[in-house]
Amino acid sequence: MDVESKISLILRYPTEEVITVEELRELLQLGHQLNHYIGFEISGFIHIGTGIVSMSKVVDLQRAGVRTQILLADIHSWLNNKLGGDLDTIRKVAVTYYIEAFKKVIETLGGDPDATRFVLGSDLYHHNDEYWLLLMDITRHLTLSQVRHSLTILGRKMGESIPLAYLVYPPLQVADVFALGAHIPHGGVDQRRAHILARQVADKIRFYPLEVGGKRVKPVALHHKLLPALNISTKPSNKEELSEMKMSKSVPQSAIFIHDSPEEIRQKISKAYCPPRETEYNPVLELLHISAFREERKTPFIIKRPPQYGGDIEVWTYEEVERLYREGKIHPADLKNATAEALINILEPIYKYFQGPGAKLLQEMKNITITR
């Protein structure tokens, strides 16, 4: 695969931005093995924003010849008091439910689960003096203002009452980029600030310098779209506000989980925010895009409509759907029905896995979340 084809794969939906495309091109042109990483907190059930959206980019990167890595961020999760702040439980969930779920999603999306390296954060840090020297080195080159700016909206609003752990978190994220040798750190657009910090210190750190062919380089940040919560009631005014209105594990009706049954998916989508003719920040359209139009279609996609309203519509591209919806030629109810069936189809192998071989993992997770 030539460089431009690799770039097209990396840039395609659901990619939101790459910082910068030209630097990515330069790295690919050098012809050396590039490494990627994406990190996840260990908390509740995996929803499709974490599962389908994130893993679709992992699969794209695999196809582009990039070595992919998933960091199971147990220490970060503990700092953020996930799963009740029980570190043993966090670690158990990470190496069981999370790894197996991600592997199944990667396989379902056409990738190779064995080609992705899974790293538990505490394993990366254990008996690793150089990691802690790296972390201290990073803090030498960051100001309190920079770290505060990298926090979530909520964290920035807390002022002087903010837990110190929240301020430790961004430097840890930056250190992970270099400790994993990640030329392409990846996350949702809500991770942009942390990745910018990594780029700012890349030329200054002494430990774990990021190199390609002996040349020191800055990490090229890859950010994918965030799925709006199904139950939003208004359109977010900007991307940062969207990060506070994204699908959330802690609000079940805001999200579709990778193990949800067809009935649950239909029910959730039927109640989703989907204003007529509105195509921006429309969660139903975003779900249809990721489930039915990420790959070039070999057959038309059918949106069923009652005969009295013109009958079924055949479309080949997402752009067609968006245009027809904006023009009012697709009713929200018909869009929701078509989206639900498309999502049920793509999630079917994952749903069957959690009904069969993965049923024990799912039940263990349910037991854990009930007691937290």
UniProtKB/Swiss-Prot annotation:
Motif ('KMSKS' region): 246-250
EC number: 6.1.1.1
Transmembrane spans: none
Subcellular locations according to the entry: Cytoplasm
Biological role: Catalyzes the attachment of tyrosine to tRNA(Tyr) in a two-step reaction: tyrosine is first activated by ATP to form Tyr-AMP and then transferred to the acceptor end of tRNA(Tyr).
Protein family per UniProt: Belongs to the class-I aminoacyl-tRNA synthetase family. TyrS type 4 subfamily.
Designated name of the protein: Tyrosine--tRNA ligase 1
Originating species: Pyrobaculum aerophilum (strain ATCC 51768 / DSM 7523 / JCM 9630 / CIP 104966 / NBRC 100827 / IM2)
Gene label: tyrS1
